[in-house]
UniProtKB/Swiss-Prot annotation:
Belongs to the cytochrome b family. Component of the ubiquinol-cytochrome c reductase complex (complex III or cytochrome b-c1 complex) that is part of the mitochondrial respiratory chain. The b-c1 complex mediates electron transfer from ubiquinol to cytochrome c. Contributes to the generation of a proton gradient across the mitochondrial membrane that is then used for ATP synthesis. This is Cytochrome b. The lineage of its organism: Eukaryota, Metazoa, Chordata, Craniata, Vertebrata. Gene3D superfamilies: Cytochrome Bc1 Complex, Chain C (1.20.810.10). GO terms for cellular component: mitochondrial inner membrane; respiratory chain complex III. InterPro entries: Cyt_b/b6_C, Cyt_b/b6_C_sf, Cyt_b/b6_N, Cytb/b6-like_sf, Cytochrome_b, Cytochrome_b_C_euk/bac, Cytochrome_b_N_euk/bac, Di-haem_cyt_TM. Its main location: mitochondrion. Heme b b562 binds at H83, H182. Keywords: Electron transport, Heme, Iron, Membrane, Metal-binding, Mitochondrion, Mitochondrion inner membrane, Respiratory chain, Transmembrane, Transmembrane helix, Transport, Ubiquinone. It is found in: Mitochondrion inner membrane. Heme 1 (or BL or b562) is low-potential and absorbs at about 562 nm, and heme 2 (or BH or b566) is high-potential and absorbs at about 566 nm. It comes from Pteropus hypomelanus.
Amino acid sequence: MTNIRKSHPLFKIINDSLIDLPAPSSISSWWNFGSLLGIWLAIQILTGLFLAMHYTSDTTTAFQSVTHICRDVNYGWILRYLHANGASMFFICLFLHVGRGLYYGSYIYKETWNVGVILLFAVMATAFMGYVLPWGQMSFWGATVITNLLSAIPYIGTDLVEWIWGGFSVDKATLTRFFAFHFLFPFIISALVVVHLLFFHETGSNNPTGIPSDSDMIPFHPYYTIKDMLGALVMILALLMLVLFSPDLLGDPDNYIPANPLNTPSHIKPEWYFLFAYAILRSIPNKLGGVLALVLSILILALMPLLHTSKQRSMMFRPLSQCMFWLVVADFLTLTWIGGQPVEHPFIIIGQLASILYFLLILVLMPMMSIVENRLLKW
């Protein structure tokens, strides 16, 4: 008699995805982040669901409802901070997951990679809308500034912005629809994750060497289930440390001031995980140019399969490309820092140089270094 997990239509899918899945024997801890992202998504949906039970998406009561959650709801404070800081952990894992893909050439699996890029956009849109919901000063002005960027689109821009706002400014209609979309999007993300995994299981996993590993596969369970559980334990511990010791470390103090359309904060900035794109946006004096650069800073990932000029897949044995990759990482961190600084000298020029370097490295220098390495190896 065959095992039920191998014969039952539903269990068979789970078995082929998590238990009997053939996995390369050499994949390192950099491959943990996919499963971690799944865990974070589940945590975000659960905490978000319980928060939504007590939240009201009305401009007059939104701020008070968040206060009520923190003060009056049993363990409401921990739900709120798990959700807010869980988003930060989500993005840390997301950036590391993308970085791993860039370093080890995972973008060669085009379908999986492109669904991943769509997922990144969807998660960023969800996080942005979630940041508006507490209806603090930074929520209101962040929403105003970022949505207003769409007015840079020629001809339809102004109409588009007013259509998104549901009026002539960010107001009750905007908050209500942002709450509706913020609730809906995680389920769309979950569906996209299934598509992402579907394409991923068509090709199998890449490995650090970038060499096909069909001849050296091991079952996912117990080897990688245990390994993923360790990664999850470490990250959940980090999240709990953040939530229980310094829950407001990554937030903005201005968001504890109720939204006031008549009083602009001295320095409007989004959450830390958008700062790199925000810095690129600010570094271009032209509004439309800034918006295009903002979108391209993430959309550039979709070009990675086209920009791959090396005869090797992974960067493991390519020291020149490694230097370029770590320059991109350093540049990303520099942009994140600049995005949080006021618009004044010397931050303006640093931001502009870092933005130019970001596109130059990815579009020109990395493909060039790959060609140089090919020549050095006489390929």
